[in-house]
Amino acid sequence: MLRRYFAAALVAACCATTATAADNDSPAPYHVGSAMRVFHPGVARNWRGAQTEALVTNLWYPVDADIPEAAHTIDEGGRPLFQGHALTNDAPVSAAHAKYPLVLLSHGTGGTAASLDWLASALAANGYIVAGVNHPGNNSLEPLTYEGFMLWWERATDQSEALDGLLADPVLGQRIDTARIGAAGFSLGGYTVLELAGARTDLQAFLNFCASPAADAICHPPEMQRLQGGAPVPAHFTPQMSASMARSSASYRDTRIKAVFAIAPALGEAFNEASFSGVEIPVSLMAGTGDVTVPVETNLHRVAGFMPNAKVTLLPGATHYTFMDTCVPAVVERLARICQDPPGVDRDAVHTQAVEAALDFFNHTLPATTQ
């Protein structure tokens, strides 16, 4: 029974600083630098069926405002998909401060770190280093795999091991204020950062929900159609998959992380009353009231009910994909599901609200030092 529900429901689970600009009329204090790192963890990630064994990580960071930025688009398959923030590649980190706070970034199912460029760039422009892992087996840079799609809890290990790599990095490691590390995530990435905060998964609770009449869209995410070209679910779990399932309810708390910001967090039904007993750091939850992909009632509200001290922000009318980058005009009609918002919803304005909330949250929970 568990195997049947795991195949039918769990595979389908889940779609998806220092100085700040005081208001929308004030320019951000920094320009945005961009770089990439490839970290090789102790356990190679290709056991998930992924094409890469490494943790490919996008970086955004503050650079001096006199360094020119260039406009760019975020491409997929060699074609522009999203409008990116202006940035400069591989420029030196600003010398205005010796160290900067760090925010780890976790994307949603089948997405990429770059699909959250709107948030990462804004944080960097306001004095944060941001690192976004492209989760192996669950990103749009390579085929989705069953392991990457089903074994959600493994994503927290990606973040922690990328953090290990960052702190050891000869260029950026010494520029990170290790007392000021946070995490932000969208959709399945929202679930991921809650795990980093100490939340524990109740896999059976989620399976029961998706097998019940109450099952909703979280049990059948649209990204499921991309799962290895619609190939049948494997009849047998590999030893690695079985071992992973056995640790699904483990704690993935990373004590280096001091605060988490979860946008449209998914898998609310994979938590129970005891799941958050180990969460002792500040948590902020945000979603749009128009989200039908990760319904607010069974996800954000359920999680918030277990964490009465969490900050909750609901943005009227915003849908799930409103929290992805703004699409380039050429693809808006073709990719209507992720590119188009309801009448009256301005995606860029929603992003501005979300950025302001994230900056306010992290500025208070990762307070500035004299460095």
Task: Label each PLM-derived region with a short phrase.
Residues 85-100, 105-142, 292-295:
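Short substrate-entry loop that stabilizes the transition state in hydrolases
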Residues 148-174, 178, 195, 204-232, ...:
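Alpha/beta-hydrolase active-site loop
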Residues 185-189, 193:
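Gly/Ala-rich beta-loop-alpha elbow adjacent to hydrolase catalytic centers
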Residues 271, 292-298, 323:
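Conserved alpha/beta-hydrolase "acid-adjacent" motif
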